[in-house]
């Protein structure tokens, strides 16, 4: 297995985006074609990692001087700890398996303190808290929480505070579910899926929720929650204080899907957003936009990930769009210095 590499993009290339506000209403194909024609493709600086750990580096989280990378397809452990920003390997945790304390399918990871993280296992419907996420320490599982059965298919999450987690609602009854981090109990549900066909939502709510599968991110101050759709060009911003909702529909349109005879929502349009991170000033997203029919034609040549980096204000205005020199799946944005991007492998 070849050594994994991380793609780093110097942030000074991005800060010039302020003042160029516009709505993103053109297709992803047009964006990439225009960038290539003008020679405006953003090239990254490679940071090699002296290890062959990764098969599919999917998410990166950073806290102080340490970084944790989630590898979806690792045979032994899902999570790997590195020093930051030099990326020296420290330890691995989150053993893959079906035994007690092991994970069947890791969905995401969030820091809950300087050396503490929460992780989500969709396969078991459980959340685990680990301590010792630092150089020279051994990660230790501190908590094992069984999520409420009404939170079925928990595919992403973020932490509202030390006691509450938000998870996209896969039942279709609402947009979000809120659960206790001490008991796993469902506390409440909020918002509605903003599908353009309300009748479809009433008739096939679970299928709509699957078609509108979303990734979520809180702002650092927890004042806004942002969601982006995996199979459509839709970004939504929710104010926690005022309950104000801003919805932005891009040029590739809302999620397209078919309802199967069994009631499942089968994606039928495009693969769109891969990741979202909200910072103090902006919303950063990685976007693909390729049609499934075109992906099928690529067969083994298909590379997962998006090449479009969008930067938006907290009000949803797109201030800058960059095209990257390779497809990537996950980002970590440090607005003071670097953007670190985990690059997936086939």
Label for each model-derived stretch:
Residues 28-54:
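A short helix->beta-strand "capping" segment at the edge of beta-propeller domains
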Residues 46-77, 284-288:
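Beta-strand-rich domains and repeat architectures in extracellular enzymes and scaffolds
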Residues 58-61, 108-112, 155-160, 208-221, ...:
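Structural signature of eukaryotic scaffold interfaces centered on beta-propeller domains
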Residues 88-116, 122, 145-146, 325-328:
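Blade-loop segments of beta-propeller domains
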Residues 180, 299-316:
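Beta-propeller blade signature
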Residues 253-262, 317-334:
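Conserved blade-ending motifs and adjacent loop-strand segments that build the rim/top face
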Residues 285-303:
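Short, conserved, GDST-rich strand-edge loop motifs in beta-rich repeat architectures
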Residues 336-345:
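Residue-level detector of conserved catalytic or cofactor/ligand-binding positions
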